[in-house]
Curated annotation (Swiss-Prot):
This is UvrABC system protein C. The keyword Chloroplast does not apply. Belongs to the UvrC family. The UvrABC repair system catalyzes the recognition and processing of DNA lesions. UvrC both incises the 5' and 3' sides of the lesion. The N-terminal half is responsible for the 3' incision and the C-terminal half is responsible for the 5' incision. It is found in: Cytoplasm. It comes from Bacillus cereus (strain Q1). One of its GO terms (molecular function) is excinuclease ABC activity. PROSITE patterns: GIY_YIG, UVR, UVRC. The keyword Acyltransferase does not apply. Disulfide bonds: none annotated. Residues 196-231 form the UVR domain. The gene is uvrC. InterPro entries: GIY-YIG_endonuc, GIY-YIG_endonuc_sf, GIY-YIG_UvrC_Cho, RuvA_2-like, UVR_dom, UVR_dom_sf, UvrABC_protein_C, UvrC. The lineage of its organism: Bacteria, Bacillati, Bacillota, Bacilli, Bacillales. CDD domains: GIY-YIG_UvrC_Cho.
Length: 594
């Protein structure tokens, strides 16, 4: 331990606060909170720890701390510091883990949508639905039952939904505000838990249709009732008080924490959320950090009540989240907490079992591959693939597998710079040259095996650069595909000879994963570049659209198809002035221009 660390540890205060661990570059790598800073920070440098925590401690060369007046203030400060520094060892719930909502838009002719983006608009949002399939099934049922507008842009004539009885065709007919309000009120009633009432009304209509000999209509209503029954079956009543509550449970094992959240809505357990992450703190502190981040995410609406395990400071949770937080001692809520705890424990056990089994298989596959090729075990494998369509935007990609597993931080993308036109062999020469020239210059780790996605020509080009230009002698193999573009066999040696592997062997599956992954990485990069160029060229002739606005539109919509489907309002939401949004919409609506 550095001497200055010992000196700082000796004068730590016995007060609540936050601490920031730093590496040799001065980068904050971990942020924590403590009821007593002196005890918590010292604990990292004393006693025994698991390997994961030892890695963290091994990187710490300095720390700083901030004293707070209370545990609540420490929790709030910790969350803000994590957001500010994004430390690599902290829990960081990603913003992309959002749940879908069902939205009724506030348009003159409202629509029913699935969205993950909750906005402060006049629309009505229902959810979240942790199970996206459940959200889509519910919307599909509502679309059948209630004839709101379906099209994002008003067509010139009635569409199929009108003929199916699922739309009132406001595009060509007058649909009054009262008509829409009546439909919207029915949808709201259904989404607020009024399934039984809606079912009863449909049942009455079904019998009336049967009496009038309207058998098609009766069958349609019967199908709708069956769909409601299916939804209700998945949401059995478990609480009689109909209070919306989130029930939390957790388990900790081998330096990992699993938190399970049961979402109870209107007395029904509708779904659960499962999160697993490494933990470097006391379990209770890690849980509090998790729950703070969980509700900071805009997709998690706070219910009326939050139920937490007995080991958690419920008063702190209540003050921080400003909702009722309880620690049940008996009854149904306690049973649910214990069930959440049990599920969390089982999830961790399954995780470790699968990891252990997968690691054994993977390492064995790497060892077997080395034996089959007659080389040392290739613990580090690097693979290359080229991608171009009709000679446009030629690119190449390199991926790395370490101990048989993808090491995504090691992946590299290459735009082809020196080759004119679609020349796969010269492109391969260029990227191999660039990759290993840099590796030699910067002292980067070299692979035990290089895999080239291609045949003899690709292998010869890459080998020539590696050996004759760079003086490197690393085993290199070509990965040959069959006529269905599937992994067939390897070629290796000079001259290259085929190495046939058993198709059901672990080493063959490893090669398939490598080939699929390098192809995916290369083609994704190529499509990104190609998509950008297509969108940018398609927008070149629109007045008021320069490079800056092209980038904004590209980032917001991602594809020309989505832009063509967008409304004027959606272009405004993307940051376009209204007059520019109208110009873009008109331009893209004219199919002849594209």
């Amino acid at each position: 331990m550095h001497e200055h660390l010992k000196e700082k540890l000796a004068i730590l205060p016995d007060q609540p606060g936050c601490y920031l661990m730093k590496d040799k570059q001065g980068t904050v790598i971990y942020v924590g909170k403590a009821k007593v800073l002196k005890n918590r920070v010292r604990s990292y440098f004393t006693g025994s720890h698991d390997g994961k925590t030892l890695r963290l401690v091994g990187e710490i060369v300095d720390f700083e701390y901030i004293v707070t007046s209370s545990n609540l203030e420490a929790l709030i400060l910790e969350l803000n510091l994590i957001k500010k520094h994004d430390p690599k060892y902290n829990i960081q719930l990603k913003d992309d883990k959002t749940y879908p909502f069902i939205k009724i838009t506030a348009e003159k002719q409202p629509r029913l949508l699935i969205t993950r983006n909750v906005k402060k608009d006049k629309g009505k949002y229902f959810g979240p639905y942790p199970n996206a399939q459940s959200a889509h099934e519910t919307k599909k049922l509502l679309d059948r039952m209630y004839p709101l507008r379906k099209c994002s842009n008003m067509p010139d004539k009635v569409c199929l939904y009108y003929h199916m009885g699922q739309c009132l065709a406001p595009c060509v007919k007058e649909v009054t505000e009262e008509q829409n309000k009546e439909i919207v009120d029915e949808i709201i009633k259904f989404l607020n838990g009024g399934h039984k009432e809606v079912r009863s009304e449909l049942e009455t209509k079904m019998y009336e249709a049967s009496e009038k000999l309207e058998f098609e209509r009766a069958k349609e209503l019967r199908d709708q009732i069956a769909h409601i029954d299916a939804i209700m079956e998945k949401q059995k009543m478990i609480m009689s008080d109909l209070v919306d509550r989130d029930v939390f449970g957790y388990a900790v094992d081998k330096g990992w924490m699993c938190v399970q959240v049961f979402f109870v809505r209107k007395g029904k357990l509708i779904e659960r959320d499962v999160s697993m992450f490494p933990i470097y703190d006391e379990p209770e502190e890690g849980f509090l950090t998790f729950i703070g981040q969980f509700y900071e995410n805009s997709s998690h609406f706070k219910p009326k009540e939050i139920v937490v395990p007995g080991s958690i400071d419920s008063e702190l949770v209540e003050r921080f989240l400003e909702v009722e937080a309880t620690q049940p001692k008996r009854g149904k809520k306690k049973d649910l907490v214990e069930l959440a705890n049990k599920n969390a424990k089982i999830a961790l056990e399954e995780k470790f079992y699968l990891i252990e089994r997968d690691e054994e298989r993977t390492i064995k596959a790497v060892e077997n591959l080395g034996e089959q090729l007659g080389i040392e075990t290739p613990y580090r494998i690097e693979a290359f693939d080229n991608s171009n369509i009709q000679g446009t935007n030629p690119v190449s990609a390199m991926i790395a597998f370490i101990d048989g597993k993808p090491a995504k931080k090691e992946y590299r993308k290459y735009k082809i710079k020196t080759v004119q036109g679609p020349d796969d062999y010269e492109s391969m020469r260029e990227v191999v040259r660039r990759r290993y020239t840099r590796a030699l210059k910067e002292g980067l780790p070299l692979p035990d095996l290089i895999i080239i996605d291609g045949g003899k020509g690709h292998l010869a080009a890459a080998s020539d650069v590696l050996e004759n230009e760079l003086g490197l002698y690393i085993p290199m193999a070509g990965l040959v595909k069959d006529d269905k573009h599937k992994t067939s066999h390897l070629i290796i040696g000079d001259p290259p000879e085929p190495v046939m592997l058993e198709r059901n062997s672990q080493e063959f599956y490893l090669l398939q994963r490598i080939q699929d992954e390098v192809h995916r990485f290369a083609i994704t990069f190529h499509r990104q570049l190609h998509g950008k160029s297509v969108i940018q060229s398609a927008l070149d002739d629109i007045p008021g659209i320069g490079d800056k606005r092209k980038k904004i539109l590209l980032k917001h919509f991602g594809s020309l198809k989505k832009m063509k489907e967008a409304s004027v309002t959606e272009f405004v939401e993307a940051g376009m002035p209204k007059n520019v949004a109208e110009t873009i919409y008109s331009y893209l609506a004219d199919k002849k221009t594209l």
